[in-house]
C-alpha cells in the first residue's frame, strides 16, 4: 500500500516539507494496519496514537482520512472509512510546558549571558555554536546567520527582535571574544548560568532553553523537518516527542 502514497501526494498542491510530513504519518499508518484496511486494524491504529497530544492526533488522522478517501476514489478499497478524534483529557504534567520568559528581554547586569540565552531561546543555537560565531557570519541586512559545525553548513533566519541585540557585538572577529580570540565553553557556561540565576531561573539550562525554542516553533506551526534543519540535526528522531 505504500506505493500509493506518492500518487496521493503528487495530486496535492503542497510544499516538499509538507509532503515529507504526510509521507511519514502515512507510512506509520500503513505499518500499523499491516497493509489491510479493516475496522479492527483502524481501531488498533487509533489506539496506537492515543497518547499523542490532541493536535498531533488531529494532524495524523487528517492525513489518514485524506489518504483513505483517495484510495476509495481510486477504487482501491471497497468502502470509505473515516477516523474521528476521540475526546481525551491529557494532564498538564504530561505536556511540555511553554514558559513565560519575556523578562529575558529586559536589561541585565550580565549582558553577554543574556544574549546567549536569547540566541538559544529564539534561534535554537548551542552554546558551543554561539561561541564560534564570527562577525562575518552575521548579516543583519538579510537577517541571516551562517553556522558551520563538523563540516556541516547551515543558514538560519535571525528574528527581527534580535537584530538590535546583535548590533553592539559586531565589532571584532567573534561575537564574543577577548583579544581577537573566542571565549572558552566554560566562560560561556558561567555567563549563561549567571544570567539565569539573576532571572530567578537557576533550574533552566542551555538544553531546556533549546527545548523552549522547539516548543515555540511548534506553537507557530513549524514542522519538525524545518526545526531539525535549523538545529542542524541529521534526523528527526530526537524530535519525535514533540509530534
From Swiss-Prot:
Question: The organism sits in which domain of life?
Answer: Bacteria
A molecular-function term among this protein's GO annotations: tyrosine-based site-specific recombinase activity
Q: Name one GO cellular component term.
A: cytoplasm
Q: What is this protein called?
A: Tyrosine recombinase XerD-like
Subcellular location field: Cytoplasm
The record's listing under HAMAP family reads: Recomb_XerD_like
| Tyr recombinase domain boundaries | 85-243
What function does this protein fulfil?
Putative tyrosine recombinase. Not involved in the cutting and rejoining of the recombining DNA molecules on dif(SL) site.
Name the PROSITE patterns on file: CB, TYR_RECOMBINASE
Which family does the UniProt entry place this protein in?
A: Belongs to the 'phage' integrase family. XerD-like subfamily.
Where does the record place the catalytic residues? 149, 210, 242
Q: Which UniProt keywords apply?
A: Cytoplasm, DNA integration, DNA recombination, DNA-binding
- Ranges for domain Core-binding (CB) come to 1-72
**Any GO BP annotation:** DNA transposition
